[in-house]
Every structure is written in structure tokens, then in C-alpha cells.
Amino acid sequence: MSFPHFGHPYRGASQFLASASSSTTCCESTQRSVSDVASGSTPAPALCCAPYDSRLLGSARPELGAALGIYGAPYAAAAAAQSYPGYLPYSPEPPSLYGALNPQYEFKEAAGSFTSSLAQPGAYYPYERTLGQYQYERYGAVELSGAGRRKNATRETTSTLKAWLNEHRKNPYPTKGEKIMLAIITKMTLTQVSTWFANARRRLKKENKMTWAPKNKGGEERKAEGGEEDSLGCLTADTKEVTASQEARGLRLSDLEDLEEEEEEEEEAEDEEVVATAGDRLTEFRKGAQSLPGPCAAAREGRLERRECGLAAPRFSFNDPSGSEEADFLSAETGSPRLTMHYPCLEKPRIWSLAHTATASAVEGAPPARPRPRSPECRMIPGQPPASARRLSVPRDSACDESSCIPKAFGNPKFALQGLPLNCAPCPRRSEPVVQCQYPSGAEAG
């Protein structure tokens, strides 16, 4: 049989040969090159192999086919073919490898004895007939420790405990060492001793013979727990101090935040108060302007603002002539029952307007029945009807320059009109003569 796809032709002859003698460990073989293996010119050499028992591998034995018969006819036929057992022919002699094993456990001879020993069921039962009478209480009669065995308390044993209790009536709480000593003397367990002392203390309490402070634990345990409580108290105090410091820091931070918030609130309140005060002043100004007898209107022409305020005063009117831009012109009208002032001014702040309104109201509150002399030559008759009067025209010429006359007329906040001259010297720039004030007949007599 050959495998050409691997590149190495194999023959049907056996490739592994084992020696019959058990002492031989290796077979002599000649060296062969790779080319010889590829060509297959040289015969297959014998390879060294450990001698195994042929019964283990079962390559050349007929029992293999019978054993494989349980897997079906195809597998049995394949196992019985000549190609499979031809690869591993071994000698029938048992090798020396298994010589160290126990001879009684050989596969054929020892099989019957081993299975017969397994067939005895009695050897594997843990039950023993000699201990049958102790089936349920097998260890009941066995004393494991004579000293630690539980023993009922008698008068002799309890007398020792009573004597110790009478000696320690002020503190009937035995320590652990004393309990162990009493248990050894009375041959009782430690639990019995502790229970007896607990019952004895309870009886003394009922009989009102209690002469000790109520203590629930021994001195050593109390000391140990006292130390633990002290350490816990120190830790608690430290934690309390840390917590207090943290709380103080938190309070300081919260106080700073509160102060900042309060300052911000105060600033906002001040701003609101300023706005409210300004609003109140504006409202009062509007109310005062509405209560005036004459309308107060503000109109802007270009960049100039003309303010017109009605004041109860003599019949004088100061108007701006159309076509005159150099200076103001003064004219008096007898037909108007009020004093109207027209003057150009720039935008004034609110405080100035409030002061102006206050002074205007002060002028308005003055009694209008007091006529003031304007000039020795110009006088008005209070009873003269306005229709019979002619318009009084004041010339443009004045005794001084316009830039100095207007501040004299309007510079005083009280509007001192008594010093306003209606008769002025001729201006050097104009050649027109001065026009005197003319009144109807009978006006000077009044």
C-alpha cells in the first residue's frame, strides 16, 4: 500500500519490527538519505521500537475482528483486512516491561480471582455484628472525659458556691478564673457554675437582700469594655470636633454668601429707590405742567427746543421776528392777558427744568394786581380795554449789544422785569431813530 500524495511510497511489508529476545532494546539500522527515500531504491530498514505485548495492541490477532463485530459489518470487515494488521506485527512473548507488576493480576489468570473477590458483598458493609447491640447508642456507654462530664449539683457542691457567695456578697460576680476554679473544685461545668450564680443573685434580689450595685458583667470584662468605651469616646469626641469645625466653616461660608446677597439686594433696592424717586419727580412735574393756566408744549425744530410757559404777568409779549437770526426782538402786546416768552435754548437737564418750573410757579403765585413800572415814559392803564390799544413796537436798536442785553433780561431766575429798559440809546450799527412808546389819549393820566 502506498501514499503517493505524501511523496513517500510505502510497501505492504511491515515497517516496525520487534525482536523476539527481551534483552534487545534497539535494532541496528543503516542510514538513508532523503533522495533514497524519495526514489524507494533501498529496502525499508528496521526501526527501533520498544517491545510491547501483542495482546495489548491486538493488531495481528483474530479476536480484534470479533471484538469490533459489535460496531457493524463494515467496521469488522475493515478490521479484518490484511492491510491493517500488517503494520504492527509483534512477537507473542510478553515483554520485560511488565515484569515488575504483581503476577497475580495478569489479565487472564487474575481476572477470575479479582472478580470473585469483588463478588463478596459482606466485606463492604460497615456494619459489625459485635457492635450490633450499640446500633443506636453506640457511644452512650463510653466516657470521653471523666473530669468534664456533666454532673448534677448536690448539697456538697453547692455549699462551696454558697460560701464563696457569702464572702463576696458586695460583689457577687465571679471572674472567669474564679468560675474555672469553682468548677474544678465542685466537679461541675463552667455553664453550671455561671447558671447557679445567676440564680443565686436573682433569689437575693427577690428576698431584698441585695447589698451590691447592679452589675451585669464581671470586673475584667467591665474593664475591657470600659477601655473600649473610652477609646470610642475619644474617637467620638474627635469626630465631633471635626464635625463642629466643618460646620463652623460651612457657617462662615454661608454667612459670607448671605452678606454678598444682602449687599446685592441693598444695591438693587437703592437703584429701585432712585428710579422710583425720578419717576415721582417726573409725575409731579407733569401734574404741575397740567395745572398751569397756559399750555406747555415742547417742539423740536432742528436742534433747538422752544419752551412756552404761561405766567400771570402784565400784558407783555416777547416774540422772535421771522427772518431775524442774529438777536432776539422785544415786543409788547396789550391785547394778550399773559406774558409769553419765546427764547431759543438747548436741551437742559431734568433738574434745571424742575427748578425752572418751581420758579415759574413762584412767579405765577405772585399777585398780578401789582403793576411794576417798566419805564418813566411807558406806562399802561389797567382799565384800558385791549381793543382800543395800539400795538407797541419796540425797535431792534438798543443801548447795548444783543449778546449783553439778553442775559440782562433773562439771566435772573426771578425774571426781574422791572429793570428791563424799553427806551434804549441808538445802536451804532443802525441809523434808524428811536421810537418812543405811544399810548392813546388819557393813558398817561392814569
Swiss-Prot record:
CDD domains: homeodomain. It is found in: Nucleus. GO terms for biological process: cell development; neuron differentiation; positive regulation of DNA-templated transcription; regulation of transcription by RNA polymerase II. InterPro entries: HD, Homeobox_CS, Homeodomain-like_sf, Iroquois_homeo, KN_HD. Keywords: DNA-binding, Homeobox, Nucleus. Residues 146-208 bind DNA. Residues 256-273 have a biased composition (Acidic residues). GO terms for cellular component: chromatin; nucleus. Belongs to the TALE/IRO homeobox family. This is Iroquois-class homeodomain protein IRX-6. It comes from Homo sapiens (Human).
